[in-house]
Regions:
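Short periplasmic/luminal acceptor-recognition loop of GT-C membrane glycosyltransferases, typified by
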Residues: 183, 369, 373, 377-425, ...
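Membrane-interface transmembrane helices that cradle and orient dolichyl/undecaprenyl
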Residues: 99-104, 141-156
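Transmembrane-helix motifs of polytopic, lipid-linked glycan transferases
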Residues: 76, 80-101, 140-141
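Aromatic/acidic, Gly/Pro-rich catalytic loop(s) in extracytoplasmic/lumenal soluble domains
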Residues: 424-493
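Short acidic/glycine- and proline-prone juxtamembrane loop motifs at membrane-interface regions
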Residues: 123-133
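Transmembrane-lumen/periplasm boundary regions of multi-pass, lipid-linked membrane glycan transferases
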Residues: 166, 177-282, 293, 298, ...
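Transmembrane-helix signature of polytopic, membrane-embedded enzymes
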Residues: 12-16, 93-116, 135-136
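Hydrophobic/aromatic-rich transmembrane helices and adjacent perimembrane loops
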Residues: 50, 284-285, 291, 302-336
Length: 493
């Protein structure tokens, strides 16, 4: 008995080391870039506005990104925040797993998630965004919900309400986990609907989310315009291809975890067969929470077509490890089996880390190696030659303008998508008095965006974009020339 206890303690130490290694490795990979990913840049910009909404999402992720970046103006702090959320999510997955699995299997249900690209490659490439926040809050919601319906502690109901409220304040997709929880409760815990703490929890969540509801009303439900713009009006075939592509990408995202689990099964002659003595309510808890969000996304694909993003489903794989070990259990997980799967996870980590690091180092892409100082210096000189006002506003393609807003000395304000109604924080009169610089890679778009950003321009206003070229160099000194355009709309009375 003491030997078994010692083995579990040893495995726990290895598990903690694994979490620390994951935190360190994936917090540093992004430093190969010269600028943060666009999602993180958007977050910093939105967070700096201190508002209760954005043109795309509720505000929480933006606030967090801005707070992480603000003290030291450091990209590393944003990458570190991302991995702190992921490791936090791992901890709550482990805590939830212990209700379904033994101690060793619970740790392994987290460890094999290293093979799920949502926890490594994707966060390393896209940085901190609302999806990363979900990687923490969804396991937290699931854990506290399970606690609430089984143990009915007031503290857990209070925490559940707070977490759900902030989860909705981060992304509306939180509903895709809340919805199956209601279904499960209806069939297996009807008495919960008579519990006063259930309603207190709902009220707490609503109160936390309510400032955003007020913001939505004040701003004519701006994020839903973004969603409407994502709907695909192209050929009908896309509406069938998109769900199929979604499924293929979901398999690709989870293939690393599936391989770690499957190879261990084969190596140790553990058959792929369902376990015995399942509790019906636990089976449906995992199936509903684990699969309903993905099914809903498939249905969404039928409506959205080609504009559906496969990565919208990545954050819902947090139950993958638990489901694998629960439905296809090992008869007994020995120390050798534990170490084999742990080593496999490290091998996957190294492979993915080197692959992503190489990609980010080799690519000559403005998304990862944007020469902010050079472009800002050149545009500032061009602005000074034409205008006697400060270079205060910049519009155009956000992947060109946001790096300048975040990193440049004077932080010119980005006009998102160059639509005034999508930028409620901008004072049109002040913009008119100071002028705007429009920046884009496509000449024809400059004309369209100029009129969108400045609705006060007369219809016959002549717009003649100026060509501009710059060199972008990767980590190995190889360069690429980008040809873009800009146009300065001078101050007007």
């Amino acid at each position: 008995m003491s030997t078994q206890v010692d083995e579990v303690k040893s495995e726990k130490r290895l598990f903690v080391i694994f979490l620390l290694v994951h935190l360190i490795v994936w917090s540093t990979i992004g430093l190969v870039r010269t600028v943060l990913p666009t999602d993180s840049l958007e977050g910093i910009f939105w967070g700096s506005l201190h508002d209760f909404g954005t043109p795309k999402h509720p505000p929480l992720a933006g606030w967090l990104t801005y707070l992480a970046f603000l003290p030291f103006k450091s990209d590393f702090c944003v990458y570190l925040l991302s991995q702190l959320f992921i490791v936090g999510g791992f901890i709550f997955i482990y805590k939830l797993a212990k209700y379904f699995l033994n101690e060793t299997a619970s740790m392994l249900s987290v460890i094999i998630l290293e093979g799920c690209w949502a926890y490594s490659y994707v966060t390393g490439y896209y940085g901190f965004n609302p999806d990363v926040v979900l990687l923490l809050v969804l396991p937290m919601i699931s854990y506290y919900f399970y606690n609430c319906v089984h143990f009915n502690k007031p503290k857990d109901w209070l925490l559940l309400g707070i977490i759900v409220g902030f989860a909705f304040l981060n992304k509306y997709q939180t509903a895709l986990v809340i919805f199956p929880m209601f279904i499960w409760t209806f069939f297996f815990r009807k008495e919960v609907f008579k519990n006063k703490f259930f309603y207190i929890s709902m009220i707490i969540a609503f109160l936390i989310f309510s400032p955003h509801i007020y913001w939505l009303v004040e701003h004519e439900f701006l994020p839903f315009m973004y969603f409407e713009g994502e709907l695909d009006s192209t050929g009908w075939l896309n509406h069938f291809v998109a769900p199929m592509l979604f499924l293929v990408v979901q398999f690709a995202v989870t293939v690393g975890s599936l391989l770690i689990f499957s190879i261990a099964k084969l190596k140790f002659n553990s058959p792929f067969k369902l376990g015995e003595d399942y509790k019906k309510e636990d089976v449906w808890f995992l199936l509903l929470l684990g699969l309903t969000p993905l099914i809903v996304h498939l249905v969404m694909g039928l409506f959205m077509g080609g504009t559906m993003r496969p990565r919208w489903g990545f954050e819902f794989w947090f139950l993958l490890g638990i489901m694998l070990f629960y439905f296809f259990p090992f008869k007994e997980i020995t120390k050798n089996q534990f170490c084999f799967m742990l080593k496999s996870a490290y091998v996957v980590m190294i492979i993915v880390f080197l692959s992503l690091g190489t990609l980010l180092s080799v690519e000559k892409n403005y998304r990862s190696r944007y020469p902010v100082e050079t472009i800002y210096s050149d545009l500032s000189k061009a602005w000074a030659e034409e205008c006697d006002t400060p270079f205060k506003y910049i519009g155009g393609y956000i992947e060109w303008t946001l790096p300048i807003t975040i990193y440049a000395k004077t932080h010119p304000i980005t006009i998102l998508d160059t639509f005034g109604f999508k930028n409620p924080w901008i004072n049109q009169e002040d913009q008119k008095k100071n002028g705007v610089l429009i920046l884009d890679r496509i000449k024809e778009k400059i004309v369209k965006q100029s009129f969108q950003a400045c609705p006060y321009l007369p219809e016959n206003y002549k717009i003649d974009p100026v060509p501009y070229s710059f060199e972008l160099t990767n980590a190995f000194g190889q360069s690429r020339t980008y040809d873009i355009y800009y146009f300065i709309i001078p101050p007007m009375k």
